[in-house]
Amino acid sequence: MTYKETPVTYIFLILNILVWIAIEALGSSSNPETLRNLGAITYVDIRSGQYWRYLSAIFLHIGIMHLLVNSISLFILGSLLERTLGSYKFIIVYIASGIGGSALSYSMISPWSVGAGASGAIFG
C-alpha cells in the first residue's frame, strides 16, 4: 500500500508518531499528568465541560507499545477501509469512531484514570 493509495492512513500514522515524540519531549507518554495536560480524557475534565478531549485523546498514546500496536492496526485496517470508502469518508468514520470510543472510555473509567489512544477510531 502506497501513500498515493491511502494518504489519510499515512497522515494519521505520521501524526500519531509525531504527537508521541512531542509527548516524550514534554514529559512522558506514561505520565498521567503530562497526558492530561495535552488532552487525555479524565473524569474531572470531561465533567467540567472539556468535551474537546474526546477528539484530542485519539492522537495520544500511553507508552511505546500502545503506539506500536495501534500503528500496526491502523496501517492494516485503515488502509483497507480507506481504499474501500475513499479518503473523505474514511476521515469521517475514523474521527466519529474515535470520539465514540473516547466517550465509551469515559463512561467506564474511574475518576482517577486517564484515557487515551486511537483504538476506538481504528476498531470502531
What does each model-identified segment do?
Residues 1-2:
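N-terminal, membrane-interfacial amphipathic/helix-forming hydrophobic leader that caps
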